[in-house]
Amino acid sequence: MNSPSPFGQNEWLVEEMYRKFREDPSSVDPSWHEFLVDYSPEPTNDAPAGNGKPAAAPTAPPEPASAPAPKPASTNGGAPPAKADTSTTRAPEKKPEEKTSPAPKAKTAAPAGVSDDDETQVLRGAAAAVVKNMSASLDVPTATSVRAIPAKAMIDNRIVINNHLKRTRGGKISFTHLLGYAIVQAVKKFPNMNRHFAEIDGKPVAVTPAHTNLGLAIDLPGKDGKRSLVVAAIKNCETMHFGQFIAAYEDIVRRARDGKLTAEDFAGVTISLTNPGTIGTVHSVPRLMKGQGAIVGAGAMEYPAEFQGASEERIAELGVGKLMTLTSTYDHRIIQGAESGDFLRTIHTLLLDDEFYDEIFRELGIPHEPVRWRIDNPDSIEDKNARVIELIAAYRNRGHLMADIDPLRLDKTRFRSHPDLDVNTHGLTLWDLDREFKVNGFAGKTHKKLRDILGLLRDAYCRHIGVEYTHILEPEQQQWLQERIEVKHEKPTVAEQKYILSKLNAAEAFETFLQTKYVGQKRFSLEGAETVIPMMDAAIDQCAEHGLDEVVIGMPHRGRLNVLANIVGKPYSQIFTEFEGNLNPSQAHGSGDVKYHLGANGTYIQMFGDNDIDVSLVANPSHLEAVDPVLEGLVRAKQDILDKGNGPDGFTVVPMMLHGDAAFAGQGVVAETLNLALLRGYRTGGTIHIIVNNQIGFTTSPYDSRSSEYCTDVAKMIGAPIFHVNGDDPEACVWVAKLAVDFRQKFKKDVVIDMLCYRRRGHNEGDDPSMTQPTMYDVIDTKRGVRKSYTEALIGRGDISMKEAEDALRDYQGQLERVFNEVRELEKHAIAPSSSVESDQMVPAGMSTAVDKSLLARIGDAHLGYPDDFNVHPRVKPVLEKRREMAYEGKVDWAFAELLALGTFLAEGKTIRFTGQDTRRGTFTQRHSVIIDRQTGREFTPLDLLTVDSDGNPTGGKFMAYDSALSEFAAVGFEYGYSVGNPNALVLWEAQFGDFVNGAQSIIDEFISSGEAKWGQLSDVVLLLPHGHEGQGPDHTSGRIERFLLLWAEGSMTIAMPSTPANYFHLLRRHGLDGIHRPLIVFTPKSMLRNKAAVSDLKDFTEMKFRSVLEEPTYTEGTGDRSKAKRILLTSGKLYYELAARKSKEGRDDVAILRLEQLAPLPKRRLAATLDEYPNAEQYFWVQEEPANQGAWPTLGLTLPEVLPEKLAGIKRISRRAMSAPSSGSSKVHAVEQQEIIDEAFG
């Protein structure tokens, strides 16, 4: 059966159920109630899911009172007779002539020509009515116009239409649908064709009916095998658009075949259509019944007789198309031949007309342009072959611009098109569709018809998936994608379709419950984008199919709760407990966080396979996309632990990242993170990016939020393939997800899926989006959800039975009930203030960080352990030699002390990751952790020699030093994530200058300083921030000590500014060995790197440990007298050396200088004990280089008097004045200010 209905051949059953539901809901299976409550039986004008409420097919209005005209007979003898439509003039009913019945005869003589052996049958019922009507039709003086019409445009457009319907909602459009609609449109131009003749008061009258009622001649087989013909009317056709016309047409045909037509259906036919062409008749002159003005007969579509023996190739070469003969048989009393001829010419024009098919395509929701009628182009086949190749390339490049990827279709007046995708632009026409062209291996063929080429290209690039991949530079990757995209579409199995439907059921049931139970609470629902659940499920399933180890998900807050429940498997009861605000006291350390920021872990088990895979969702803040680099770092850490390499079997932990469309285009960290994708220090073997594109950012429309065509354009920078997919087509989304994983596995690169959908509610559940997007939300408010539209499509295409649909509906209701049942069992906890996390991790007592002198010697030797044929740069070689000397003789500088600390860790089997801009050499040419061959460029890393012991056995240690991209936000986020993923590694990131760390402020605020308190997420990442006032200007001076101290609380991190190489050594050693997982912020020196006073003896490494407060060496060595000190200068960092030089120069025994090496947590007891060593101190000053409103003073000025009120209640500050910038831009001004600080300190 032909039907554009969403339910195809099953539409009648659904509509019958809907009718019963309207009359008595209890008469319909309860599983259908929720589905039918907002069901509209008319077809929508969208695919795959309708927008807005579909318009109902109009019903005939009450007919004005008038006397009936004479009853005409049905077309071609159809029974029962049709009734004339109303007119403005009353026509009195004619009284039938009285007839007297003849007396019965004993036997009737056989008619002439009938022998006694012939079989005779008395015609009764419908057959008798045919005889009567045919006889009556002899009284109608008719004439017939005949016109041969090219059928090619209609044939080709019907192919396009039905291919679209087959892929979307099912059903077919017949030629009679198109022809009937063209007749109705032609009648509007020639209304006289809709008139009929009558006699009123004995006078001839031309009756013009109020409406066009098109009579369809329907051939019906009887139970006895005989055929009968009925003519039923489609009423009020002139008021219908194409979708309504098809619905009314199919309703009449279906009821005729089911024997459910009523007398009203036969009444009022004004013009008829009969199509004997369906049985091969080429030319027909049907009889015209009384009460009608015309009947149109359609013949079979055939090639002209002289070409019917030609081959298909020859016909295509000559440009010969099929013809259809139309006849118009009309009542010559009221219609003239010219009118009938013009009427047929109009139908002819319509069936070739662009606008006619444009309307039909729009009504059926076909998003691209129809086949256009054009004159054949006489160019040679060779010229056209080149154009076909160009056309294929155009579709590969720009096919996505014509893809039907927007489920809302807000602009229904515009076809998705592009000049490059128009065959006419390439000098090709519909006459070329059946011609063969060389295609150079396209779809695995050497030659293909243009029709097949176009069909495959549109299926591949222009349906519900738009693909961008031609920006990829590697031909192998392009070819791999083409081989999988340019193939015949294969539907999922029924089992897979049911599984997809079950995931949609779960997604919608979850959101429905939350909306019902927690009205108005913020949850950032997934409604409108539920397809992301089966999409993610499919991607994870494919990862399991490849035998991978884990999928780690990072995502924003929208849809997060649904993902936690339906992907990660977090129990409903736990999620709803968080909704109730009932935090478990045993877990409520720190501040906690809102429910849609929390993470979880689970295991995914395949539905159609035997594998399982770990799945985790990382915690995130509301700072959109800030989690991106954190996820990548965490995954890299897990991969490094597994250590499966970079080959085909490597990268077995998969990062899956969800984004919003506005954020993906708008947040710079997206580009920063993408830029890391292929760098050796940051590769994770490809990320699966899924953009939940609801086409709005809070209240901002796409045209206000990005300059690019797509939100995904930024991903082209790394050569990632991009798939745009319609979120209302779950099967397409699932197919793309699997392909994305396969591509990632093959090429170890990122893949981007842009799933276009919508947001059913506002940005949050308390927001009203219609204030700013009224048109969009008018569409959304009446749009059926994807679960229902997918169910319709499955039934309409015949993929599942009505019984299976009922089972799916019961599954949905069962899942909803399951959620309701779980929430009744919620565990209740009393609410109490949250406790601090500070005491959760304590420094172990008696921990030693000293090392044996022999180990220091090994590290020194390693710096001269390069191969004999290695060409060390002449400026680097003296540095390496000096380091070996320091390892044996002392006077260790800062850079070598750092390498000694790292070397000892490697010897102890620890993994070290050290990154940053210019980190391997060092911004200040101080580190040289990796040596480059002056001639060949090969690398030598001295510390790698410490990963084996003196006997050559591996220690298990790894040293990974990388120069990072020029990024702070993504780079710091990555290292934080790495430290979370591998808590046993020592992870260091160094800023080029400390000033630039503010580029990573979101990571510092949201993760480093508060991740433990909010999520219980532990990290011991180390930030090294070069800091110090040296006259280099405001942007090369300050690591912003004040900001870190402001963020510090609850022991959230350690903030230090060591002043000696040995103390820095012990600080790093303590951090790596104490078992406390909290970030370490170190403000490192610049000019002090080469200060000859800033060196340490070997015994400081072999006998000491980290000291949070340092006195001057003269006091600790016993040469100074503490009792003489009356003025105590507290300071930190490199300023100490300037103060010490001034003291030494002036011999000021009355001044003592104390260094606070650890700024937070404040070493209160050690500081108090040290101050007690100076019994005669009278004045206390905090001396800093930084302006008064910066550095440590804004915090210490408040804290020191509180913690040590006996001594420091009156502590004063010595510093630069308060400044908005960190320093002066003039080196001369700097020198003056610096001198003033020193002078005031000793005043």
UniProtKB/Swiss-Prot annotation:
Pathway: Carbohydrate metabolism; tricarboxylic acid cycle; succinate from 2-oxoglutarate (transferase route): step 1/2; Carbohydrate metabolism; tricarboxylic acid cycle; succinyl-CoA from 2-oxoglutarate (dehydrogenase route): step 1/1
KW Hydrolase (keyword) present: no
Chain positions covered by the region annotation 2-oxoglutarate dehydrogenase E1, C-terminal part: 354-1243
Protein name: Multifunctional 2-oxoglutarate metabolism enzyme
Name of the gene: kgd
Assembly information from the UniProt record: Homodimer. The 2-oxoglutarate dehydrogenase (ODH) complex contains multiple copies of three enzymatic components: 2-oxoglutarate dehydrogenase (E1), dihydrolipoamide succinyltransferase (E2) and lipoamide dehydrogenase (E3).
Binding-site list for 2-oxoglutarate: H597, S622, H1036
Chain residues that bind thiamine diphosphate: R558, S622, L624, D661, A662, A663, N694
InterPro entries: 2-oxoacid_DH_actylTfrase, 2-oxogl_dehyd_N, 2oxoglutarate_DH_E1, CAT-like_dom_sf, DH_E1, KGD_C_sf, ODO-1/KGD_C, THDP-binding
Biased composition (Pro residues): 59-71
Catalytic activity annotation: glyoxylate + 2-oxoglutarate + H(+) = 2-hydroxy-3-oxoadipate + CO2; 2-oxoglutarate + H(+) = succinate semialdehyde + CO2; N(6)-[(R)-lipoyl]-L-lysyl-[protein] + 2-oxoglutarate + H(+) = N(6)-[(R)-S(8)-succinyldihydrolipoyl]-L-lysyl-[protein] + CO2; N(6)-[(R)-dihydrolipoyl]-L-lysyl-[protein] + succinyl-CoA = N(6)-[(R)-S(8)-succinyldihydrolipoyl]-L-lysyl-[protein] + CoA
Record keyword tRNA processing present: no
Coiled-coil blocks: 799-831
